[in-house]
Amino acid sequence: MSSQEIFKKYEQKVVEYQDHIEELKSTKNDYKQLIDTLQHLPDTLQPKIMVPMGKLAFFEGNLKNTNEILILLGDNYFAKRSSKQTIDIIQRRDKDIDTSINDLREQIKGLKQRVSMTTDLSKALHEKEYDNIVEIKEEYNSDEEREKEKKRKQKPQKSTTTTTTTTTSKDKPKTEEEKKKSKEMDEEFDKMLKRLSILEEKENKMGDDYDEEEFNKKFNKKLDITGSDEEYDDDNYNNNNDDDDDNDEDDDREYYQEEGFEDEKPENSNYNKNIEEDDHDDDDDYYDEGEEIVEYYDENGNIVDINDPNVEYIQGDDDNDDNDNEEDEVDVELNESELEEIKDFHMDKKGQDLSEKEVKELTDFYHSKQKKRISYIDTPQPPTPEATTSITPKSILKTNSSGNLMSTIPKSYNENDENDIRRYIKNLDKQEKFENQKTISVPNPPKDVAFSGDIVEKETDLFPFDEIPKPTPPSNAKQSRFKSSRQNK
């Protein structure tokens, strides 16, 4: 292709891009006008317009629903939007048009640069023709290249043969000096490994109280890495590691012999003995000779820890406690009414639970009252003028522990005395009877039930049904003339 044809193609491309830019600019102007009209349409209800009837004919008309606009989305798809939404859509399309215009301008610049490059090259070629410049030409033979490639492949094979010869030279028998050096290196390596294994064992035994600096100082003082082979014999070392866990004392002795801690050996050898003695002493102190050991069992007979939060403790009836109580108590014959009075010693006037101490005081007081055979006959007696002189059951128990109860407790029963224990017991008895007699009020079920869930025959008298009365016409109803004339006849 000549340079002139190339220039023509570049010029045609530039013209096409410029035409496309002008089309985009025209659409941009149309969008601006459309935005102006959409902004003014909602101002009036029915604006007047000229409706086109073909290319030349128009007639007057009015727009309705100015806020509803159909927008073409593409491929004959439309969507209803308000005027504000359509303005936003048009502005976005306007931005896309600006970006496409900028891209076309950049492409035009690129084409112009190519045109300038081609002109420069064409000028250079014309100048070289006049300067008598000769091109270099060489013959090409594929056979020669193949031979060269074969030679290149043979070179790395030779290098591999040389490496094999060197390896065979290394496999020659070693001298005595080399053997000694290798043995020394192996021994040093074995000693280092032994030292590391000892350090790991010591660290595992020490646990959290392990300090690397202190242990390394002691270890370096006691242990000679360059020692004789007798101290670090492989057979002895392996035998020590293969012993069972049951022989702890023998393992400790061999371990300290290997480490060289001779000073600490007697202390640690007696360590287990001291621990056993301490445990024995603690057991003797904890379990005295005259003390009982209490154990707790579940329903299946298994021992249970009472401190476990997942276990509920249910106190059983112990035989020993019953025997002790029988020795302390005195046999007292009680009537049925007296037994009912004892029932509610655990409740106060308000129905709240009493503490264990208060219940014990009341029971002791009641038994002492039965021993002294206090009369329960109701005798009228004037009320006491001073309420402060009356004594509560607790104060009676505290003050009359040494003296007689008869000096403070009146023999006759007084209903008005609030501090009398007999009145308190009777009130509790009444409260218990009232709670037992309480019944929950249930609403009475209806007598006539429409359907109870059972199948019943139609002609039965189980459900009384009233006959439906016939509708009666209203008194003031108007009749037609035709109907009234027929009735009169």
UniProtKB/Swiss-Prot annotation:
Record's compositionally biased regions (Basic residues): 480-489
Location in the cell: Nucleus
Gene Ontology molecular functions: chromatin binding; phosphatase inhibitor activity; RNA polymerase II complex binding; transcription corepressor activity
Biased composition range(s): Polar residues: 396-413
UniProt feature, compositional bias: Acidic residues: 227-265, 276-298, 315-329
Segments of skewed composition (Basic and acidic residues): 169-188, 215-224
Principal subcellular localization: nucleus
Pfam families: Prefoldin
Superkingdom of this protein's organism: Eukaryota
Any one GO cellular component localisation term in the record: nucleus
GO BP annotation list: negative regulation of intrinsic apoptotic signaling pathway; negative regulation of transcription by RNA polymerase II; regulation of transcription by RNA polymerase II; response to virus
UniProtKB keywords: Nucleus
InterPro entries: Prefoldin, Prefoldin_subunit_alpha, RNA_pol_II_subunit5-mediator
Low complexity bias: start-end ranges: 157-168
Disordered: annotated span: 141-188, 200-329, 396-415, 434-489
PANTHER family, per the entry: RNA POLYMERASE II SUBUNIT 5-MEDIATING PROTEIN NNX3, UNCONVENTIONAL PREFOLDIN RPB5 INTERACTOR 1
Family listed: Belongs to the RNA polymerase II subunit 5-mediating protein family.
Protein name per its UniProtKB record: RNA polymerase II subunit 5-mediating protein homolog
Species of origin: Dictyostelium discoideum (Social amoeba)
